[in-house]
Structures are given as structure tokens and as C-alpha cells.
């Protein structure tokens, strides 16, 4: 049996003391003159419960049949070995005993889903959420685990007495569930393996370039849908397998609906007030027996994200988003026969993957300075209590100051974001500002994709704006389909202007308060945030330096690099993939036609999978003698998954902004070549003609 409480997956350096993160003795902090700062090394080693991209309904946790234990997976990165360590953890829900690791090991299993007609999309880089399944007796867990590139089903004793693979096939297993203590049903797609083998055979004669290709993620055809799912049943005692019956398949496919609950004969669900309008508010609906549905008219019944029924107490509990720009989460209790909800808890931050256990919820919870942990939330009093924290020592570090910002932008839209200031910030001091996009709910780690280290940037002396993208103007209007709304948002880049205007409004607000130096503002972004970087550098004069994790927003990337299938689909959404860069659509975002007008130093930190899409824009900037650098990380995806790369991205981002916004350099000998390149870029910038002002 391994105790999670004393396990120390990685070592870090704090001053001259080398110790293990999560196991730093209290005396070490007490003896120190001051608490140590949050460095990139500390941030990259933080342990995560589940996947980095979890939402309120992501199934992060699994309660035992008797409710006495909760099981979950923890991942911790080690940049020295460049490995992610995975642990399957079991914790008593009463908190009376230490958590134990029932399994340690496995490879990084990428989250991939069918999309755009591909049977399996290219990995985004995020890890798949692994929700363990409890045996009916509560003695074992079954779960997916990848080793040597093969996804199998593993079984572990919940007492920590051992774990081993129990199901392996010629194809990857995609789901598993217990039928009884000795029988498992599982699913996978053997046809996918067969289709890949056919592509391999075809390659001997040469592949025809067609809609199977997505050049941005590789020079190989992708398998297209449909690929049938096969369901098998394994008898653990005899080892025999057979095809699953329809009833057994239904057991595996049955998933709880987070927006549906029963209390006695009353069914509660959520529906839009106008079913034909995709932007109409959602509200709670109750249907008693075979009677007519009754809509709850209370404002508190809108924007519900999760619900649970309690038949014993004749009560419905639900979580919802509320407050300014829906920046808070709240828990409500409502009598099943009254439709009068009462709020019992609310806060900024996130509750994720909640499971109800008697009179409380067990949830993954995070806030601005609190990484994801497990808590219990009392359904009567609303009291929150910690249950399990995989990063217990972070609070002993010298943490920056965080302020929640709210404003109404120039388009009348409610906005929230977070301002993060150095721990020793003195009121009235104007600091250089770094903007990190584009979600600011929960722990302020590295923004979307986790590439721009918020707390270490603040520790380095920057003010950091953790920017939460506003709702689009179109989202307040009536549309009958997402395609129609998307076309409206891309018309004249309407939504991108809304985002840029919001950023400028926030910069102006911080300038008026005397917090920032408006001449030293840096902008970062990944994915949609990268598009905002490209758009912002071309259409605004506010940014003195920028870092982007992908590039670029132009015709080549949208049409050529996305291939025939996706580029055709994008056009339906309002993206003009058949228009050249100098056409009216791309003129607002393309570096190719705007290079001579730009002067902002730009660092592109790209995955090798995506760098080809950056070359037209990067080359145009280079040929125009503009300060730009392209770094390529091998074997990476849209979101970087390798710990060594994440640490390198963290450090280079801080170095870039210190160089351009603070005129500071790191004297470390191994960074000498980096600063030689950057000083050459600075000299190049000083010699180049003045750029054309942005509109």
C-alpha cells in the first residue's frame, strides 16, 4: 500500500535546499527568511487531478457503491526526465485515512475524438480524462491505461494490493464497465486498426491527396468515419470472451445526464425559453408524472450546469453560473414541489466533476491561487471542507496578489478578468503588463493551453492580466443555428474587434488607476488567443511585445494547411478559405500583407506539428526585417504535453518579456546565444523604417 500523503514524485530547488515538492518540511519554511517565490520549475511540477481542460461536467471522480471512497487519477510532470507520472488514487470520503496510490504508471494518453468526419481527430495535446469504474462490491477498480502505445483495461485492488492488465486486444480499448464482480464489458474499434493498415498498404503505391489529409497535423491520410464500435464481454474467472448483448451494451453506453434529475415522480430538466433560438436563456423545467411541464420563472433557475435529486428530502440541488458576466458559481437547494430555489453557496472559481454523496457533494475545486483539489460541500449549510490536496505546499510559497476585475466594455457587454500583481507590489507603481488569454476561471496557471506562466510572470515584476474573453455581440442576438451565428461573428471580424476593444478598455482602466505603464504591454495567446494576437498586432498600436503559441491567421493556414475537408467546412462558418491574403477578409489578420506595417517583437513557440502554417507569415516578417523568432518543439501538438517543453516555454516567455519590456537579460551562460539573437533583432528593429500606424 502506498500513501499518497507521503509520496514525493519530483524534486525542486528552493534556495540552496533540494527537496521534494508536496513534501517540503514545515521547518524548512519556518527557518527561511521569507517564503520562496513561485518559479516556472514549481509551476510545471504541480500535480493535476484529471485533465487540464476539465469543465463542470467532466467526470473526474468516481464514488464507490457505498459512497465511502472516491477514486481519481493524478498526473504530475517531471521536466528533468520529461515524463508525466500517473497515479490512480483512492481516498476515504470521510477524510479519516490517508489517500493511497492503488496504481502508479502508464503513458500519456491523448484526448482524441471523432470530428470533421475523421474517425479519430489529431491529438490536441490534452490528456484523456480517465474515470475509474468501481466493481459492484467496491473491492476493485477497472480503468484504461496506455503502455507501449497500447490502451488496455487494468484492474486494481482498492486496498493497494496490486494492479495488472486484464483486457488486451489488437485494438485500443475505449470504454469499460462492470456487469458484476467477475464480468467486464468493453468497447473499441478494430476497424480503425484495419483502416490504418490499408492506408499503410496504399502508401507503398503512393497516397492520393484528397479529403483525408489534414496537412497541419501530418503528411499522412487520416481514417474517415464511419468506423463501427465493437462490444465484448470478458469473464475474469475463465478468461472467455463473447459478443455483448444489446442489454449489456446499453449498460456500457448509459451515462448520467448532468441536466436531468428525478425527485419522486417529478422529472427536472433544462430547456431553452425559445427552442428555435440557440442563444435563448436555459431554464429549469419540472414535469410531475405525466402532467404538463412547468417552467421555473426565477432568475436563479437559469444557466444551470449540473443537478441532483434527493428523494428522501424531496429536494433538488443544482449548480449554476451567475453574477457579473457569469463569473461566479453557485449551489442552490429547491423543494421539489415549490420551484423556489435558495442559494446555499457561491464563489468565483470552479467546481468540477461533482458527485453527490448523501448530504454533501464531493467535487474537484480550484480558485485563482488554489490548484485543483478535492473538497466536500455540505448541501445543508453550504460549508466547504478540504478532502485531498495533491499540492499541499503551494500555499507556503510567496504568492502574488489577485484582484477580480469587472467592467462593461464599449460595446455594452459585461466582462471579467483577473489582475495579478507581484507579491511586494507597492501602490502607485506603474508596471509593465503581460496579457494572458483567454479563460480566467479557476487556478491562474498558464492561460488556455498552459503556456504563459501567470504566477512566475508576476513574481518577475510584471502586472499580469488573466483575460477572460467576453461573450460575442452576436451571442445576444437570435440565431437558429451555430453556423448562422458564426457567419455573423466573422463578418468584418466582428467578434475579433469585440475582443480587441475589450483588451483596450481593460488596458485603459489599469492605466487610469496608475497600475501599468501603457507603453509596455505584452500580449500572449494560443489557438483562438493566437488569432487575437495576430489581429491585435495588425489593428492596434497598444502592444510592445508579443508571444504566440501558433501562427498564423491567413489564407494559407486556413485553406492549404487545413486540407480540403476542413477548409470546405470552415467556409460554411464564414471563414473565406478561397480568398487570397490581399482580399478584404484576410487583410485584417494576415502578416503576409501587413508585414511592412508591423514593428512589435514577436516570439512564436510552435509545435512541430503546426509550424508549417507559420512559415508564410514568419517569412514575410523576416523579409520585411521585423523582430520575429520562431521556436519549434519536436513531437508536439496544439497544446504542448512534454514537461521539458512546457518548462522551456515558460522560461523563454518570461525572458522575452523581460528583454523587450524591462530591458533585462538573464546572465546564465546557457542563454548567451538566445540574447545574442535578440540583441540582433533589436538592432534590426532600430534600423528598419517606422511602421505604418494601426487604424
Curated annotation (Swiss-Prot):
Q: Could you say what the effect of mutating residue 438 to F is? A: Loss of activity
Q: Please tell me, according to the UniProt entry, what happens when changing residue 527 to A.
A: Loss of activity
Sorted alphabetically, which keywords does the UniProt record give? Cytoplasm, Disulfide bond, Hydrolase, Signal
Q: Where is this site: Important for activity. Binds to Astexin-3?
A: 116, 562
Where, by residue number, is the active site?
527 (nucleophile), 610 (charge relay system), 638 (charge relay system)
Listed SUPFAM superfamilies: alpha/beta-Hydrolases (SSF53474), DPP6 N-terminal domain-like (SSF82171)
Entry-linked PANTHER family: DIPEPTIDYL-PEPTIDASE 5, SERINE PEPTIDASE S9 FAMILY MEMBER
Spell out the protein name for this chain: Lasso peptide isopeptidase AtxE2
The scientific name of the source species is Asticcacaulis excentricus (strain ATCC 15261 / DSM 4724 / KCTC 12464 / NCIMB 9791 / VKM B-1370 / CB 48)
Amino acid at each position: 500500500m502506498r500513501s499518497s500523503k507521503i509520496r514525493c514524485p519530483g524534486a525542486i530547488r528552493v534556495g540552496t535546499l533540494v527537496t521534494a515538492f508536496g513534501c517540503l518540511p514545515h521547518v524548512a519554511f519556518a527557518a527561511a527568511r521569507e517564503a520562496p517565490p513561485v518559479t516556472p520549475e514549481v509551476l510545471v511540477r504541480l500535480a493535476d487531478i484529471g485533465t487540464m481542460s476539465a469543465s463542470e461536467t467532466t467526470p473526474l471522480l468516481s464514488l464507490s457503491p457505498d459512497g465511502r471512497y472516491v477514486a481519481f487519477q493524478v498526473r504530475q510532470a517531471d521536466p528533468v526526465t520529461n515524463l508525466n507520472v500517473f497515479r490512480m488514487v483512492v481516498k476515504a470520503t470521510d477524510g479519516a485515512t490517508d489517500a493511497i496510490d492503488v496504481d502508479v504508471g502508464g503513458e500519456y494518453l491523448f484526448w482524441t475524438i471523432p470530428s470533421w468526419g475523421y474517425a479519430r481527430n489529431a491529438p490536441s495535446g490534452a490528456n484523456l480524462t480517465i474515470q475509474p469504474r468501481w466493481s459492484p462490491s467496491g473491492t476493485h477498480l477497472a480503468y484504461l491505461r496506455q503502455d507501449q502505445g497500447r490502451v488496455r483495461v487494468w484492474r486494481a485492488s482498492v486496498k493497494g494490493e496490486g494492479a495488472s492488465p486484464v483486457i488486451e486486444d489488437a485494438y485500443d480499448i475505449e470504454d469499460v464497465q462492470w456487469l458484476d464482480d467477475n464480468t467486464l464489458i468493453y468497447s473499441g474499434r478494430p476497424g480503425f486498426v484495419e483502416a490504418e493498415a490499408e492506408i499503410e498498404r496504399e502508401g507503398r503505391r503512393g497516397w492520393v491527396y484528397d479529403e483525408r489529409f489534414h496537412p497541419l497535423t501530418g503528411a499522412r491520410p487520416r481514417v474517415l468515419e464511419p468506423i463501427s464500435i465493437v462490444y465484448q464481454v470478458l469473464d475474469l474467472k475463465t478468461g472467455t470472451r463473447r459478443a455483448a448483448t444489446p442489454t449489456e451494451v446499453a449498460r456500457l453506453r448509459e451515462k448520467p445526464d448532468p441536466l436531468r434529475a428525478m425527485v419522486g415522480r417529478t422529472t427536472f430538466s433544462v430547456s431553452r425559453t425559445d427552442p428555435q433560438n440557440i442563444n435563448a436563456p436555459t431554464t429549469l423545467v419540472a414535469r410531475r408524472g405525466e402532467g404538463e411541464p412547468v417552467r421555473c420563472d426565477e432568475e436563479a433557475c437559469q444557466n444551470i450546469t449540473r443537478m441532483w435529486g434527493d428523494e428522501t428530502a424531496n429536494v433538488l440541488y443544482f449548480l449554476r453560473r451567475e453574477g457579473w458576466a457569469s463569473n461566479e458559481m453557485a449551489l442552490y437547494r429547491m423543494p421539489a414541489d415549490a420551484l423556489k430555489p435558495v442559494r446555499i453557496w457561491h464563489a468565483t472559481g470552479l467546481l468540477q466533476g461533482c458527485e453527490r454523496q448523501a448530504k454533501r457533494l464531493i467535487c474537484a475545486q480550484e480558485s485563482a491561487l488554489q490548484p485543483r483539489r478535492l473538497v466536500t460541500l455540505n448541501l445543508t449549510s453550504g460549508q466547504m471542507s478540504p478532502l485531498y490536496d495533491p499540492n499541499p505546499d503551494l500555499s507556503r510559497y510567496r504568492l502574488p496578489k489577485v484582484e477580480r476585475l469587472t467592467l462593461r466594455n464599449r460595446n455594452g457587454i459585461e466582462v471579467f478578468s483577473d489582475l495579478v500583481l507581484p507579491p511586494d507590489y507597492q501602490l502607485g507603481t506603474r508596471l509593465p503588463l503581460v496579457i494572458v488569454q483567454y479563460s480566467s476561471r479557476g487556478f491562474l496557471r498558464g492561460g488556455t493551453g498552459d503556456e504563459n506562466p501567470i504566477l512566475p510572470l508576476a513574481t518577475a515584476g510584471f502586472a499580469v492580466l488573466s483575460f477572460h474573453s467576453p461573450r460575442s455581440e452576436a451571442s445576444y442576438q437570435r440565431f437558429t443555428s451555430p453556423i448562422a451565428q458564426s457567419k455573423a461573428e466573422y463578418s468584418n471580424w466582428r467578434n475579433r474587434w469585440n475582443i480587441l476593444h475589450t483588451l483596450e478598455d481593460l488596458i485603459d482602466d489599469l492605466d487610469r488607476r496608475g497600475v501599468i505603464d501603457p507603453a509596455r504591454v505584452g500580449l500572449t495567446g494560443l489557438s483562438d488567443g493566437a488569432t487575437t494576437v495576430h489581429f491585435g498586432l495588425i489593428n492596434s498600436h497598444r502592444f510592445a511585445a508579443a508571444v504566440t503559441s501558433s501562427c498564423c491567421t491567413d489564407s494559407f493556414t486556413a485553406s492549404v494547411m487545413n486540407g480540403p475537408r476542413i477548409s470546405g467546412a470552415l467556409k460554411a462558418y464564414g471563414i473565406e478559405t478561397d480568398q487570397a491574403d490581399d482580399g478584404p477578409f484576410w487583410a485584417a489578420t494576415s502578416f503576409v500583407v501587413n508585414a511592412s506595417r508591423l514593428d512589435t517583437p514577436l516570439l512564436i513557440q510552435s509545435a512541430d506539428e503546426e509550424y508549417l502554417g507559420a512559415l508564410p507569415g514568419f517569412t514575410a516578417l523576416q523579409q520585411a526585417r521585423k523582430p520575429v523568432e520562431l521556436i519549434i518543439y519536436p513531437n508536439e501538438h496544439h497544446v504542448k504535453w512534454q514537461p521539458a517543453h512546457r518548462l522551456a516555454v515558460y522560461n523563454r516567455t518570461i525572458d522575452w518579456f523581460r528583454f523587450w519590456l524591462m530591458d533585462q537579460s538573464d546572465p546564465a551562460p546557457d542563454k548567451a546565444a538566445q540574447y545574442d539573437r535578440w540583441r540582433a533583432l533589436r538592432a534590426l528593429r532600430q534600423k528598419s523604417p517606422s511602421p505604418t500606424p494601426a487604424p
